[in-house]
Amino acid sequence: MSDIQGCLEKGHLGIYSGSMRCWAACLGDCSDKMSREHLVSASLFLEGNLKVQGFDWCKGETVEVGIAGLTAKILCVKHNNDLSPIDTAGAQAFATFREIRRLANVREKQKPGYRNVKRYRIDGIGLERWFLKTLINLCCDRGYPIGRGSQIVGRPSDDLVRIAYSLGSFRDKAGLYFVARVGMKIESTDTVIFAPLVQKDVPRVEGGLFVFRGQSFLLFL
């Protein structure tokens, strides 16, 4: 069974319902129809059901739901479809980490000896944008503006929207960081965990910490 855990401050994370404005509306050309965007890409997971924890309706317990239940009307059809390459990049990275763990499990059972070096490639820019898209999805229409340039509660800045759609890039020290240390324990399972980084002095989402199939990443906005 796959897992998704969401960790936002109390009262600021949930499954959204009803017709809501597309969070990429600043790009223009919105479709008339809203789509049901998966908060976390369904293509990551091999199974149809997920174990979910940390949302408003399951704060104190783990609940099993179908992937289709973790959706929200926060993107129009056009802008949802335009993010398909980003979903693919996230799914391919997730599958790569899964394969790395599978091969490691096989080799751990073999006798000591020479091993061929196996190299893997991941679309780093695509994965960075997948994390950004997912952060926006999970924080959309919640209690804080998303990013330093946003003045609207629960909405991303225009710059972040453009980055998510490959129309811009992070500047200075903003962007995606890999978090690791020697001796760090990694539990590589089909799990995604998210916790936002919230600025208290000027309340807004400044970034997020992700555990992505056991690998820790920091996205700084």
Regions inferred by a protein language model and the residue ranges of each:
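Intrinsically disordered, low-complexity boundary segments flanking structured domains
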Residues: R21-C26, N116-K118, L197, R204-E206
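An N-terminal structural lobe/cap that precedes and organizes the functional/catalytic core
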Residues: M1-A89, A95
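Alpha-helix initiation/capping motif
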Residues: C30, S41, D123, V153-S157
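Short alpha-helical interface elements
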Residues: L50, I100-A104, E108, I152, ...
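C-terminal, charged low-complexity interaction regions
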Residues: Y144-L221
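Short amphipathic alpha-helical surface micro-motifs
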Residues: D3-Q5, D56-C58, K111-R115, T191, ...
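Internal, well-ordered alpha/beta segment that forms a basic, Gly-enriched binding/recognition surface
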Residues: G28, D56-Y144
